[in-house]
């Protein structure tokens, strides 16, 4: 039976509670005292409530009994829960997107500017890193596993915060995707704009890898060393692409804008490579001393497993990465030192030449400005707090050249054993461009790398041939670079 309100003065709704909640028409063919057709069919209670007043409620109690009020509250709560469940069912789940677990944002390839980075020579050889495909992914200068904004704060967390210049994005390649090349279910890390996070992530990765290498097997240590060197090589390639892109633009537009890479990033790259080499040398000396105290069988097996490694515990692939990285550094420093040399004139000269630091994004750093002209040069000046040498270009250039000279000497001492070993192999190779040598090395299969990296015929290894070609390609530039730095150092010491 229908359960209307007992008070005859109360005006009831035209629909029962259930029909009102479901927003359907409520009909009673059995009369006013019977249940509605729907409640009669479903054999449920049919309650007709009074109209709710709009505004402030009356002070007197509800004219309906307490049982009716409790039933109304239960019905309202149950209807609200059903409505929320229906809304949740209507919301479709988001589609899963395949992504690469890397610091590279591969969507940037489609948004590249006027400069085409999809060249076959832009392939870095990672076939020996257990890549399932013979065509590893391209290494683009528009790279981001820690992609910093080009206008981030200067020198945050950097040992070169004294240089009053900006920063640029740096590749942070996740080697886990190269070991198992293919789609992953993890999302790519979004581009962040927190200054200093790039340096912190680099230091954290270096500490983690050094900690793991202390307790890993020889194969794991070799793999982690190759990973660190490949990361460093990718970062240097980003810096070199800035120089190369600007040089190509100048040759096509006949502009006279100086080209160069951010000096603070170049100095950081030199320090990082020196740190990698010194860390590996210290670990090698400690492990060799511990192995010499052991005369059991496992030590002999371990020594046999390390028989293919070269000086400082470097194998062929590590030697190749070091050679290419050193060649990149020489090529990047060449235009910087040339521009600074013009600025380091004797005191009293009116020359005001400056090194133009293109600190913008690699794909747009060398492009013309929005007004149609070339990009405006930025002066690199040494600053310590409020003290700055921006008004003293000659002294500023001499100090910068002194910093570069000292750091390049450290790098030369750290890489000299490896480079000397590469040069003494006497592999007959023709001098080719550095990027063409990378493309040739990337076209090799894993079987070729492995088969040529062992045994007494190692001097014919194509990997060492590539390393020697990279070193030979910058032989003249290296001599000129060191001669200029020595000349500047002698003139600076005589002036001071």
Swiss-Prot record:
Entry-linked SMART domains: GAL4
Keyword ATP-binding: no
Name of this chain's protein: Fusarielin biosynthesis cluster transcription factor FSL7
Keywords carried by this UniProt record: DNA-binding, Metal-binding, Nucleus, Transcription, Transcription regulation, Zinc
Location of region: Disordered: 57-102, 189-224, 281-307, 348-379, 444-470
GO molecular function: DNA binding; DNA-binding transcription factor activity, RNA polymerase II-specific; zinc ion binding
Polar residues bias (residue ranges): 65-89, 207-218, 355-379
Subcellular location: Nucleus
Entry function: Transcription regulator that specifically up-regulates the gene cluster that mediates the biosynthesis of fusarielins F, G and H, decaketide compounds with 5 methylations and a decaline core that act as mycoestrogens as they stimulate growth of MCF-7 breast cancer cells. Probably binds the 5'-CGGNNNCCG-3' motif present in the promoter of all the cluster genes.
Organism expressing this protein natively: Gibberella zeae (strain ATCC MYA-4620 / CBS 123657 / FGSC 9075 / NRRL 31084 / PH-1)
Biased composition (Basic and acidic residues): 444-460
Domain of life the protein comes from: Eukaryota
DNA-binding region(s), chain positions: 16-46
Comp. bias (Low complexity): 281-294
DNA-binding listed as a keyword: yes
One Gene Ontology cellular component annotation held by this UniProt entry: nucleus
Signal peptide: none
